[in-house]
Amino acid sequence: MAKIKKRGESGAAKNYVTRNQALKKLQISLSDFRRLCILKGIYPREPLNKKRANKGSSAPASFYYHKDIQYLLHEPLLVKFREHKAFAKKLARAIGRQEWGLAKNLEDAKPVARLDHLVRERYPTFTLALQDLQDPLNLVHLFSTLPTNPIPGKTLVPSEVIAECSRLISEWKLWAIRTHSLRKMFLGIKGVYYECEVPGQGGEPVRVRWLEGFEFQQHVPHDVDFRILLTFLDLYRTMVGFVLFKLYTDENLVYPPPLDVELDEQGESVGAFKLVERKAAEGADGKTQVSKKAVRKAIKGIKAAGDDADVDMDEGAKETDEEEDEDFVERPSKAQEVDDVASAPLTTYNSLLATSSTPARQNLLFSPYTFYLSRETSSRTWEFVVRAMGGKVITSLTAPTPADAPNADSITHVIIDRPITVERMREMEAGRKWVWIQPQWVADCVNKQKIISSEGYGPGQLLPPHLSPWDGEGELYRPWLEEQGEKAAEGQEGEEEEEAAEQDEGESEDEEEDGKEEVAAEYPPALLAAAQNPSDASLLHAAELEAETNGVSHSAFRAQLKEATKVHAKKVPASQKEKKGEEDLRKIMMSNKKAKLYEKMQYSNREKAAEKEKLEKKRKAIEKRKAKEAKA
């Protein structure tokens, strides 16, 4: 006879433990348990049957996996938490006895918990760390902009933490400027979105996107729990430090980069740090030792440069061949390739280093230009963007007047974000040719990866719509904006023919709209909706309520509904009737629950289509009005 199982020793009661049971098992406080769970990535679970998991009790409780709590028992941070608890007791006793020397010694020997092992556990590979770098960068930047004054009723964020966050953000931007890895940016409501391309393991690029708030005074809300945020920040600071060390080491740079105190006191953020290359290791005989990593990186750079050169040569050969003879395409001989390789000079270590030090694909869009940032623009944002794209930045013209400044001759573009008169522009230029633009021009050039025309971006002009470069990742496609760009680039050719065609189309559209308006004026809107979809009970009920509000009798309402249904049926083509019949057959085969869900989906789709049509008509009306204003 089988042994009877005891209650609570198997199943959900064994797999799950409540939070109170976990606290007793770990012998720590609730605050330490929360901090430990955040650092280790453990979160509450939802059992299928809470009553069974709670051993028959129906009291509300938070549940965790039993294996997760067993895993926490071996965490080295538990020892640090207990040491900190003992330290707090000793420090409180010393302060109570006014033993200030002992209190200072205890403060100097305060136990500090290191989180390096947690970063290695949670991110075993460098690519995984890069894929999860968005939240750390967002939080680190948020704390770098917090005020250092006390928050009423809250714990003050230490100034050392804010300074370290500012340093990490500056080091990250400095690396992006050095490698020219900026790819996209967007000026949103919350702030400025950036996207960089970071080389991961094996040379595979990883896209890292983060958000930086605008430079406004931060008002910290009172309902924010800074203890939880600081716990996340401790982990994220360590993680960002790991990533930056790896990135700087791969670029043969010293990390952390040294800080110029004088420039830092002058208010320079990124420019206060100096990039210093690491010295090559020397052996006992004084010769330079070459590491395997440096050789692999140099070979990879040579391969990339060779591939680019081959592609360029192939494209050039194809273009010339197509111009001479489109039917014949000449291919290079394999024997010739072998002779070229055999006759080529041998590759030396110095040539390897020279090739690897200059990346094959650098994003140097603004390299020929020098930008002057006006006082009202955000120097932190636009200096980073311009320098990351290879350009030069001037933030101040040291002279009594801008025209007399010694560095004014090198300026090619002026970024200004306020209206300015033509006389003032000519006075500042003093005979020079400067391009006056608004900041959006820089962002649009970065997103399109090319220098676009500055027309329409002048000071005080109405800017074109600033679109998100990530629109293709799930949002609606808006082809008319591309059509506008093509029309602006090609010029206005054949305007008279287009105007005549537009007039004909407008007349036909007006006739169709007049016919629709006549039908709409004859019947109320709810009645028309019910006539278009007679099987929808909700639309029929809404039409009945509308008729009752208008004082129409039930018999008259039925007659109007029947007549409107007939009118709509005449306009419906045969293909739509067949489609409607197929949908009805599908609904017959559905269960009642699925049929209701299907009706809800169809209703939401109709609402979206109606809203889309409404916005489309509004857009066309605005375009027509703008075209008329431009002609006038």
From Swiss-Prot:
GO terms for molecular function: ribonucleoprotein complex binding; RNA binding. Residues 595-632 form a coiled coil. It is found in: Nucleus, Nucleolus; Nucleus, Nucleoplasm. Disulfide bonds: none annotated. One of its GO terms (biological process) is maturation of LSU-rRNA from tricistronic rRNA transcript (SSU-rRNA, 5.8S rRNA, LSU-rRNA). Keywords: Coiled coil, Nucleus, Ribosome biogenesis, rRNA processing. Residues 307-328, 492-516 have a biased composition (Acidic residues). Component of the NOP7 complex, which is required for maturation of the 25S and 5.8S ribosomal RNAs and formation of the 60S ribosome. This is Pescadillo homolog. It comes from Cryptococcus neoformans var. neoformans serotype D (strain JEC21 / ATCC MYA-565). The lineage of its organism: Eukaryota, Fungi, Dikarya, Basidiomycota, Agaricomycotina.
